[in-house]
From Swiss-Prot:
Organism phylogeny: Bacteria, Pseudomonadati, Pseudomonadota, Alphaproteobacteria, Rhodobacterales
Positions with biased composition (Basic and acidic residues): 198-239
Oligomeric and partner information: Monomer.
Localization per Swiss-Prot or TrEMBL: Cytoplasm
Organism: Jannaschia sp. (strain CCS1)
UniProt catalytic activity: an N-acyl-L-alpha-aminoacyl-tRNA + H2O = an N-acyl-L-amino acid + a tRNA + H(+)
Descriptive protein name: Peptidyl-tRNA hydrolase
Gene, per the UniProt record: pth
PROSITE patterns named in the record: PEPT_TRNA_HYDROL_1, PEPT_TRNA_HYDROL_2
Length: 239
């Protein structure tokens, strides 16, 4: 079994916060992949399901962010899991919005939710780092992550959540590369194979315009042959 933990704060007040993007991600996975209804357990809410043959328990701690480790530790001990069976989904201010990275182990980088998890299960767990951008100064970080996403963020946020849901089976199998590819296909879909680079379009447009000008240009009219004698030409000149 794998334990996937979505970090966030409980309550409607925090539901749309940047700090709650981890909750949003596991909610989307549960909804799209037919997981069981959420139920209260382990100082949080849990939902069980299967992703490509892998049993996964989703957990949303309701302890508030700074005590998330209590919930994670309790669930891990109950199922006799190792910390390497745990994947934590969390907001990441050091990544631009819509950027995602998968990481195995490491520090908590000042993230209070990760700090709490470190204290209860150690640092050797996996993370899905969900970029939300940085406010520009460290003093503004608390207010920034505890604020709702802007309306302008709705498009990329929906793409990211769809992408992580698409890629969830790959992540469950341990293929982080395919997981990230699935996200990328939602966030930055490839150009159509029939589309042409802009420069090529411009060159073709210019060539076509030149061809059209050439076709529509009226050639000069031919002058009739002058059959007059020299005497007639001289007489006509002085008329």
């Amino acid at each position: 079994m794998q334990l996937w933990v979505g970090l966030g704060n409980p309550g409607a007040k925090y539901a749309g916060n940047r700090h709650n993007i981890g909750w949003m991600a596991v909610d989307r996975v549960a909804e799209d992949h037919g997981f069981a209804p959420w139920r209260a357990k382990f100082q949080g809410e849990v939902s069980e399901g299967v992703l490509d043959g892998e049993k996964v328990l989703l957990l949303k701690p309701t302890t508030f962010m700074n005590l998330s480790g209590q919930s994670v530790g309790e669930a891990m001990r109950f199922y006799k899991l190792d910390s390497t069976d745990v994947t934590v989904w969390h907001d990441e201010i050091d990544l631009a919005p819509a950027k995602i990275r998968v990481k195995a182990g490491g520090g908590h980088a000042g993230h209070n939710g990760l700090r709490s998890i470190h204290q209860h299960i150690g640092p050797h767990y996996d993370r899905v780092r969900l970029g939300v951008g940085h406010p520009g100064h460290k003093d503004r970080v608390p207010g920034y992550v505890l604020s709702d996403f802007a309306k302008a963020d709705a498009g990329w946020l929906d793409d990211v959540l769809r992408g992580v849901s698409d890629g969830a089976p790959h992540l469950a199998r341990g293929d982080g590369g395919k997981f990230l590819n699935a996200v990328a296909l939602r966030v930055a879909p490839p150009r159509s194979s029939t589309s042409k680079p802009k420069a090529q379009d411009n060159r073709e447009d210019a060539a076509q315009a030149a061809e059209e000008r050439s076709e529509t240009r009226t050639p000069p009219e031919a002058r009739p042959e002058d059959t007059r004698s020299a005497l007639q030409k001289l007489a006509d000149k002085f008329r």
